[in-house]
Design a protein with these regions (language model features):
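N-terminal secretory signal peptides
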Residues: 24-68
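C-terminal motif of bacterial Sec signal peptides marking the signal peptidase cleavage site
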Residues: 15-18
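Bacterial signal peptide processing site
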Residues: 20-22
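Short Fe-S-cluster ligation motifs
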Residues: 82-105
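Extracytoplasmic
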Residues: 37-39, 62-66, 77, 90-92, ...
């Protein structure tokens, strides 16, 4: 058994710790609720699109969620559209719609009050 690749990988681990990373900050909210996400205060206003693939289906495309949000930063207020897993550049970083619950189902429509959104902000490096 050749241990050399394993030893090299273990020796490289401390070097990975030296990489500069900025931790992401997240918040989970409903429509109309405001979350502090990094330097932003974000309020989801309206689901513009929810084309996610239903749990019971096999889809070629996973689909997406488009969400209208109000963002307050440094006293300024603006309305933006965020799209699932597509970062939006704001306030020296990126705002991302990182998760949406509940999963879609072909058997029932999701009521607006049932949506939960996970928003994440990552500072630019």
């Amino acid at each position: 058994m050749n241990l050399r690749p394993t030893l090299i990988a273990l020796a490289a681990l401390p070097l990975l710790g030296a990489c500069a990373t900025v931790p992401a900050e997240a918040g989970s909210v409903r429509l109309g609720q405001t979350a502090s996400v990094g330097p932003l205060r974000v309020t989801p206003l309206r689901v513009l699109e929810d084309s996610r693939c239903p749990m019971e289906a096999r889809c070629v495309w996973a689909g997406q969620v488009r969400l209208q949000v109000r963002v307050v930063h440094a006293g300024h207020r603006a309305v933006h559209e965020v799209v699932s897993n597509k970062p939006l550049a704001l306030a020296g970083g990126n705002l991302e719609l990182a998760g949406v619950m509940p999963p879609t189902s072909a058997l029932r429509k999701i009521a607006p009050r049932d949506y939960r959104f996970t928003l994440r902000f990552e500072r630019a490096q």
